[in-house]
């Protein structure tokens, strides 16, 4: 069995144990690397307050923030803005605001859009525009209003009784005379003339 380089150490192949002794620094004290700056005028993240936009040396209320409203951690605990930040998602995430619930500061444009809806036209809010064509609401008929039929009124009379139809005259049990309006049938109740054949109408008789 020939010897190998693993079994017999050689000065050409020193064996590494994997454990290295730490080398002390020159000054004798542990030094930390300087924190990396995020940009001009912005310090390192401290983990306190609003983590998006809090420069060093300034308070959270004066700092410039991209989120609408005051930063997290400011204001009373019972305020609605603080309650939105402390929802079921935790205080680290701010709840979403739609364009109708998020108030915008006075004199500034809301970043998410406008929160005012367009009002309907004034004619659509008039209760009698569809029924009375604007006569009572606007002081006169509009030029595009449909004209009513002759003899009909647009306003229904209040508490006016409806006209009843005239009562029908009932005939007594002894009066069996036919009514004058009933048509008379020529072959019912009286002797009707015998119908002539076509030959008789032409003047030809069967006798010749």
Curated annotation (Swiss-Prot):
Domain of life: Eukaryota
Biased composition (Basic and acidic residues): 1-18
Sequence segments annotated as region (Disordered): 1-122, 135-208
UniProt-recorded name of the protein: Putative uncharacterized protein FLJ46214
Species in which this protein is naturally found: Homo sapiens
């Amino acid at each position: 069995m020939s010897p190998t380089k693993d079994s017999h150490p050689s000065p050409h192949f020193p064996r590494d144990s994997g454990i290295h002794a730490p080398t002390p620094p020159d000054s004798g004290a542990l030094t930390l690397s300087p924190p990396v700056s995020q940009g001009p005028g912005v310090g390192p993240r401290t983990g306190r307050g609003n983590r998006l936009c809090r420069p060093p040396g300034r308070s959270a209320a004066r700092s410039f923030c991209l989120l609408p409203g005051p930063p997290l951690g400011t204001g009373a605990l019972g305020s609605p803005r603080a309650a939105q930040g402390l929802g079921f998602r935790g205080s680290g995430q701010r709840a979403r605001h739609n364009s109708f619930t998020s108030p915008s500061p006075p004199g500034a444009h809301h970043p998410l859009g406008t929160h005012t809806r367009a009002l309907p036209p004034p004619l659509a809010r008039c209760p009698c525009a569809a029924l009375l064509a604007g006569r009572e609401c606007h002081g006169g008929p509009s030029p595009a209003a449909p004209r009513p039929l002759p003899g009909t009124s647009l306003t229904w009379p209040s508490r006016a009784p409806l006209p009843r139809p005239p009562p029908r005259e009932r005939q007594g049990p002894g009066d069996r005379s036919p009514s004058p309006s009933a048509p008379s049938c020529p072959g019912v109740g009286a002797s009707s003339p015998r119908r002539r054949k076509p030959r008789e109408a032409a003047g030809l008789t069967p006798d010749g």
